[in-house]
Design a protein with these regions (language model features):
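Short, flexible/disordered secondary-structure transition segments
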Residues: 132-136, 151, 167-171, 195, ...
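Acidic, Ser/Thr- and Gly/Pro-rich intrinsically disordered linkers and low-complexity segments
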Residues: 45-68, 191-209, 431-435
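Alpha-helical repeat/alpha-solenoid scaffolds of the HEAT/ARM/MIF4G superfamily
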Residues: 166, 172-197, 212-349
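Residue-level detector of extended alpha-helical repeat arrays and alpha-solenoid scaffolds
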Residues: 70, 74, 115, 153, ...
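Short amphipathic alpha-helical interaction elements and helix-loop-helix interfaces
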Residues: 128-131, 146, 162, 166-169, ...
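Alpha-helical solenoid scaffolds in large eukaryotic transport, assembly, and signaling factors
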Residues: 1-155, 159-176, 222-226, 240-241, ...
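Eukaryotic scaffolding regions of large macromolecular assemblies
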Residues: 348-361, 365-473
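Short inter-helical turns and helix N-cap capping residues of alpha-solenoid HEAT/ARM repeat scaffolds
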Residues: 70, 107-111, 145-149, 191-192, ...
Length: 473
């Protein structure tokens, strides 16, 4: 009976059980809880919940800090109305918009638990076909760059990937795929527009507060490719655009995708989570050093912490670089490049103009990618060989990868006049009695591979000099 339902108004699980059995008999009971939910939601939506005490709001309403009990009650009511929304679609038709508004417009005002409750409620509505995938994904994507919680980001990414996967399980869903890819393009392009005031690159603590929108776009697109859900030119175009992104993490992840490391974006995400703990420790020591008594021991601890953080980042970068060299490359994606010549020229321009800005590891990755694109598509970028010449020294860090990249870029259509100076530079620097046998072997093998790909680049006098080293392996 209705009286029996009223007895459970403060016991939401029991009331929920009754309402699910006979929704029409308990409409008034649900409406009472809905109105209670609405009153608490308006407090959150008005920004009152986290305002400073004593502040005044429009409409002569005084700002009141919401208590923990009220927050807990709101979370319970939110779960309650989401569970019963299919039974009362007319009453709860505004619920999806409420959840989206709370998550996107009042994200900073919500407690971590309330954010998760809103997300779970939205997922529940989506699973019960009350909201479309388009609405669901358009709400989740902006949250990736808003939230600072690694748990929340993991939940969001899993929900996004699973939703796209299920939509394409039986057959491709071109409408949804185009919509999501459009969102991802927008996320990357916003980071490349210097006039956009919302670009994450402008924030001083961008490296400490997690990934940018563009990095999440690269990660989602890479994951879709890895799962063989998206294998089209549009996905490749998105990742190709990210290869020249001004944010170093975004660029590195996109480049590593084309080099064959399909987990690059995911690894970059985990790395940023791990790195987030390092600067936090350094920042704590800096704060203690500022406000506390200045001692030599404290300064020494701070100096050691900074050195440890730098050393760890360098080790991670070098390890990732060596792993990338072992991959055969994502040739399927490279073959799908829409305009390989323009992509190669843009990539080389980014490499040469950012010569001082890029770290050596990033430069080597770009060299590797550029050489593979040139080899696969038979491209000719003349300035590439003169640029590479300055790195052709035995003592150069990562010289083996640089030599491999140079040789790999050569093909039968490469002009001989741009290769001859490079071969001479290698011969003079690597092939002479004053260096070790390993250095001579590296130089000879590189020259041998270049000549195998383009035999006409070898000059007779240089060949006669190199004959003495023909047994170097």
């Amino acid at each position: 009976s209705k009286t029996r339902g009223l007895l459970h108004t403060h016991n939401l699980p029991a009331l929920q059980n009754l309402l699910k059995r006979d929704p029409s008999a308990y409409t008034e009971d649900f409406l009472a809880q809905w109105n209670h939910y609405e009153s608490l939601r308006r407090i959150f939506a008005s920004g009152v919940g986290q305002q400073v005490e004593g502040a005044a709001l429009d409409g002569n309403v005084s700002a009141v800090r919401m208590s923990k009990d009220q927050q807990s009650q709101f979370d319970q009511l939110l779960s309650f109305v989401a569970q019963l929304a299919p039974s009362y679609p007319d009453i709860t038709k505004a619920l999806p918009e409420h959840l989206s508004e709370l998550l996107l417009e009042h994200h900073a005002s919500l407690s971590p638990e309330t954010r998760k409750t809103c997300f779970r409620a939205l997922s529940l509505l989506h699973n019960r076909q009350m909201i479309s995938s388009e609405f669901f994904l358009k709400t989740l994507f902006p949250l990736l760059s808003m939230t600072s919680s690694s748990d929340m980001r993991t939940m969001l990414l899993h929900a996004i990937v699973q939703d796209i996967k299920l939509a394409n399980q039986k057959s491709k869903d071109p409408r949804l795929n185009r919509m999501v890819q459009g969102l991802l393009f927008g996320m990357v392009e916003r980071g490349m527009n210097p006039d956009d005031t919302s670009v994450v690159l402008r924030r001083a603590d961008a490296e400490l507060k997690g990934r940018t929108e563009a990095l999440w776009a690269v990660r989602v697109a890479s994951e879709m490719w890895r799962r063989r859900i998206w294998t089209d030119e549009r996905t490749v175009a998105l990742l190709a655009m990210a290869c020249t992104h001004p944010h170093p993490k975004v660029q590195a992840s996109a480049v590593r995708f084309f080099l064959g490391d399909l987990h690059a974006a995911e690894n970059a995400g985990h790395d940023s989570d791990e790195e987030q703990g390092e600067p936090e420790d350094v920042g704590r020591l800096q704060h203690q050093n500022r406000v506390g008594k200045k001692t030599k021991a404290a300064e020494r601890r701070l100096k050691l912490a900074k050195a440890h953080a730098r050393r760890r980042r360098k080790e991670q970068s070098e390890k990732a670089l060596d792993e990338a060299d072992q991959e055969t490359g994502n040739l399927a994606a490279i073959h799908l490049l829409y305009d390989p010549q323009s992509f190669g020229e843009t990539l080389f321009e980014n490499l040469s103009r950012g010569d001082k800005r890029h770290s050596l590891e990033v430069k080597v990755r770009i060299m590797q990618l550029l050489s593979r694109v040139m080899s696969v598509h038979r491209l000719t970028i003349l300035s590439f060989y003169s640029y590479m010449a300055k790195y052709l020294m035995p003592h150069q860090l990562h010289i083996t990868l640089i030599l491999v990249s140079l040789a790999q870029s050569v093909h039968e259509q490469t002009p001989t006049d741009v290769l001859t100076p490079a071969i001479r530079k290698i011969a003079y620097a690597f092939v002479h009695p004053g260096v070790s046998a390993e250095v001579v072997a590296a130089g000879i093998n590189t020259i041998r591979e270049i000549c195998r790909r383009q035999p006409w680049c070898m000059e007779q006098d240089l060949l006669e000099d190199l004959v003495a080293y023909r047994h170097s392996k």
